[in-house]
Amino acid sequence: IQPVKITNYTQIFRNTWAVSESTRATLTIAGDTNVAESRTDCAAFHAVDIEKALFFGQKSTGSRNGQPFRTMDGFQSIVSNLTYYPSSYAVANVTTAGSTTSYTQLEAALDPLFNQATDPKVGNERMLFVGGTARKVINAIGRLNGTYMMVDGQTSYGLQFQTFKISRGTFKVIEHPLFNSNSTWSKMAMALDLSTFSIAYLGDRKTRHDAFGAGNAGDNGYDAQGGTLTSELTCLIKNPPANGIIYNLTAGVAG
């Protein structure tokens, strides 16, 4: 076994919610109270910030307001970094698709992921996180490489593939809403070996909620209620060569 050292920074995530006491006291026609909705929205924004960094974060260090400021490498940066691969690898497991992609080309892009076995108890299976365009390409590849029949009286039609196989492994396709936020990410596919991935918190710095208002001690007469969610963590990929990325999935063809 050839050990490879992978380094990363921890990143602090903070999101704050607040509503005035007037807003708190205002009754809503439907749904949760204003306090509950604001708190829930804050939790959702906090989760999205963390998830975006886990996928697309880039490691950096600097300062803000005289204090140190760090960001972490996410899945994309780690898997794309050839220095995190054994010396036998000439290139990272990253492929940019052409204007069209066939099954043969898709298999060629994903096959190297199975040269590494992270956990012998886990079969050759990967999660494939994709955008909407990439999902349609993968679906088209399956549809154009097979046949299906429709019969009289049929009230629905079409094909929707959730899983596909290549010679050496299986991929479960998951369309991630975050990937649909722009056209570039929509054409991406990230193949993740779950046994290589984990979130590493700095000590006890798991998500913490600090509230103010609502009669909490030390509120100094705030005419509001609110709180702050704080987490400090990093993305941990133990075996980058077991993962992979495909860019620019544009159209599927037979072959």
Segments predicted by a language model, with ranges:
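Core alpha/beta structural scaffold of self-assembling particle/tube/pore-forming proteins
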Residues: 1-255
